[in-house]
Each structure stands twice: as structure tokens, then as C-alpha cells.
Amino acid sequence: MSNRWLLPENIADVLPSEARKIEELRRRMLDLFRTYGYELVMPPMLEYLESLLTGTGHDLDLRTLKLVDQLSGRTLGLRADITPQVARIDAHLLNRPGVTRLCYAGNVLHARPAGFNATREPIQIGAEIYGHAGLEADVEIQELMLAALQVAGLSDIRLDLCHAGILEALLAALPSIRQIEEAMFAALETKDVPALRELTQGLPDTERDALLALPTLYGGVEVIERARATLPASPAIGRALDELAALAAQVSNASVNIDLSDLRGYHYHSGVMFTAYVSGLPNYVARGGRYDKVGEAFGRARPATGFSLDLREVAALSPVEVRAQAIFAPWDADPALRFAITTLRANGEIVIQSLPGHTHELDEFNCDRQLQRQGANWVVVPR
């Protein structure tokens, strides 16, 4: 009996004060996206597994909860990431010829937590641009991501930039690397140079030296010039570094770091990647980048770039106060009071009628005004 109310590990209820804050930030961000011209879409919570994982990497498969559809007998997946679903909508349902801007907000479910104490039910919100291959789309998405963090009240943001094209160019001449690929990615992400040195034994000197240099290419924008001097002078690497320099130059409201070994999502991304951190905290608060290859898996190759964040994580960091301003009203059968309350609520005001015998029901609200009888009418006065 005592464990009936227990929830699965890393799953938690959202209580009123947190829910109010999350909803306030969700509305602010969606309103922000709308001012940029982004259209809201609402993909389903579950899909056939093969559709849900189309064009994604092995990591998303591991994070996806599976179940059997009792109607069709086919395997379903509960979404662990909304981004591929939005790419499917753009490629398969909308089928527009030009630029499309889409945004979304909804719960996702992870089979395994992404980190220590991480929730398995994030509330993901994000925005995507389809149809433009130029860096201008990446600049807009990067700007929108930083603006979303600002409307949440977060400040002192650091933006880390990377580019999937650099590693792709280094690995293009190394087909044998596929055998150690996962271990190599893990060593690069953790900047474990000794492990990377051991893994890359036997590789050609040029590529091995470049791979060993990636974890050291971390710091301010001056890292880009260090990378030009350190990495092979291939056209692909040169273009990638040029794009990073151009993207960094567009940032005015955050500090910029270059981290050429921050390769989380490498199999998914195809160009620039950016990650936002709040100063002093180890975990990122938002991630984005270019992923041109995903739409191709749905039968329509489209340039694409976007970002996403977890509203629950951002709400926990946000200083935004959302204790609602409300109007107190007594419990009274007077029709004039009912009319006054109905009119106020129709105008968007929160009006709380105190039920007889209860004194603590207003604690979650700031009732700075009250309805008071004046003659035959009820009027709002300071409380």
C-alpha cells in the first residue's frame, strides 16, 4: 500500500509554483518565436518506431521507450526528441518550396536519464528553419536561442561553437576508423587525450596529430586561427573555420568560446553546432545546429538548422517571478457580485472567491486588490 504513490525513477510531478513558472516561460518563448515568423506545430507523442527514428543516430534509439501497438501489432516509440518529428512534418506533410520556420513545445520521454539527477520527462521547446543553406539561417537560430534564454531572465550566457564538418573532413580518408568511432567520440568529448592517443595508434601522422589536437583547440575566438595553423589545410576544414568565425562575429549578447571537440550529436549534425551555458554551471541549457541530412531520410533533402532546450531545466534557473496578481472576493450570493466577478474574469483578471471557513487558499497568489460592496455595486479597491 505504501508505494502506490511512488513514481518511476527520474520522473516527478510538477507542482503549482513550478508549473506556473514553466507555463509562463513557455508562453513567453512561443510569443517570441511568433514575432520572428515561426509557426507552431504539435507532433504526436508516439509514432511507429521506424518513422520516429528515421534519419537519427543510435543514441536516440537508446533513449526511446518502445511498446507494441495493440491495434496493428507494430512497434511504437514514445518520442525522445521532437526535432526529427518536425523535420518529417516539413519534408512529408507541408512540402513547401521555400523557407519554412516552425516551432514546437511538448513533453518528451527518455528511456534513460541524460545525466545524474536529470529528468526522464523533459519539456522540450525549440525552433527550426528549413530551406536555406546559407549561414544566415544559422545566425537567426543562434540569435533566437539567446533571445529565448533572455526572456527567461537568464544572463551571463556563454556560447560554445563547434563544426561537424571539421571531424567529417578528418575522418573522410580513414575508413578503418569506424571500428573505434564510438570510443573516439567519447574520448574527444571528455578531452581524454591519453585515451585518444592510444585509440589513434597506427593512423597516418597527419590525421592522428589533428585528432589529438582537437581537445586542445578550446578557448576564445583566437582558437580559430590556432586551428588554421594546426589542422590540415583542406578546403572543407577551411570553410568550416570560416563559418565559425562568421557566426562568432554575429554574437553581441553572450561570450563566445570555440570548442572543436564538443561533438555531441555529431552523427546528427552536418555543420555548425552551438551550445549555451550559464556561467558557473557545468551543464548546457540549450543546444542547436545544422542538420541538413535528416529531411533526406524522409524523401526530401532540405537544408535545416534549429535549436531546443528543456523548459524544466531553464525554469529551475530562471529568476522570473510569476506569483500571480489576483483580486480577492468574498463568498456572497449577491447577483451584482457575480456580475462583477464575471466581468473581471472576462477582462483577464484572476478573481478568487474565498470559500467559507478557509483562510490559506490564497497563499499561492498575491491578492493585492479586493472586491468591496459600495452601495448596490461591487468595486475593486486596494487590499
Swiss-Prot record:
It is found in: Cytoplasm. Keywords: Amino-acid biosynthesis, Cytoplasm, Histidine biosynthesis. GO terms for cellular component: cytoplasm. Pfam families: tRNA-synt_His (PF13393). GO terms for molecular function: histidine-tRNA ligase activity. GO terms for biological process: histidyl-tRNA aminoacylation; L-histidine biosynthetic process. CDD domains: HisRS-like_core. Pathway: Amino-acid biosynthesis; L-histidine biosynthesis; L-histidine from 5-phospho-alpha-D-ribose 1-diphosphate: step 1/9. This function is generally fulfilled by the C-terminal part of HisG, which is missing in some bacteria such as this one. Required for the first step of histidine biosynthesis. May allow the feedback regulation of ATP phosphoribosyltransferase activity by histidine. Belongs to the class-II aminoacyl-tRNA synthetase family. HisZ subfamily. Heteromultimer composed of HisG and HisZ subunits. This is ATP phosphoribosyltransferase regulatory subunit.
